[in-house]
Amino acid sequence: MKKQLALALALAAASGAAFADGHSYTYLEAGFAQLDQELPGTEGFEVDDIEAGGFFVAGSAAVSPSFHVFGAYRKGDDDVGVSSPVLGEIGSSNVDMSQAVLGVGYHHGLNARTDLVAELSWLATEIDVKGDNEGAQDGDDVRAGVGVRHLIADNVEVWIKGNYTDGDVYDGAFSASVGLQYKLTPTWGLVGEAEGGGDTAMFAVGVRASF
């Protein structure tokens, strides 16, 4: 019995150590994403905001003990309604919205459970209104972000980050990102993230494989 108890304790300790083995900066993830964009009304008309639901794929790779590269692609579509205070709903148009992200990050351990993270990235955003004969509207932006990743439990990680984005689509916009990962095993986990600020927002839920 003592040997069995010792074995059980050893297995539990090994499992907990595997879960709590710091923060991984090498991973792949995919799932559902929604890209939101507030739209201004035009004189005499009201235009619904874009809430483009679809998918995302993302990944990160550690290139040194302190640096990592990362990227993501998100794409969704929505039927955006147009209405008039006098005539009511006039119709709707299908809108495709996508965003690609590519960047580099620096991470530094503050303690055994908390990392400071700073990132610099490029964003390419495209919005295409089907049937308007105008072609897609796109733009490039640069984003700087800083935040922390923290293990609140051996298999639960949270992160929060502040961002500043400027360029063609974002006009000096501040935003905040918050996320959570629940590790099912040392490799597999469930992730969720939300970002908002200015007239844009993003929500995503998916599965992550950490290496």
Describe the function of each predicted region.
Residues F32-E38, P65, Y73-D79, S98, ...:
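Transmembrane beta-strands of outer-membrane beta-barrel pores
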Residues E38-V47, D79-S93, I127-Q137, Y170-S175, ...:
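Outer-membrane beta-barrel translocator domains and adjoining extracellular loop/strand segments
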Residues G16-V69, Y73-D79:
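Short glycine/proline- and aromatic-enriched beta-strand/turn motifs that initiate or cap beta-hairpins
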Residues D48-E51, N94-S98, L110-A112, D138-D140, ...:
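Solvent-exposed loop/turn segments connecting transmembrane beta-strands
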Residues M1-Y25:
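Cleavable N-terminal export/targeting peptides
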Residues L28, P65-G71, N111-L116, I152-I160, ...:
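Repeated loop/turn-to-beta-strand initiation elements of outer-membrane beta-barrel proteins
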Residues G16-F19, F56, V63-P65, G105-L110, ...:
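Outer-membrane beta-barrel proteins
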Residues V57-A61, L102-Y106, L120, V146-H150, ...:
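Residues on the lipid-exposed face of transmembrane beta-strands in outer-membrane beta-barrel proteins
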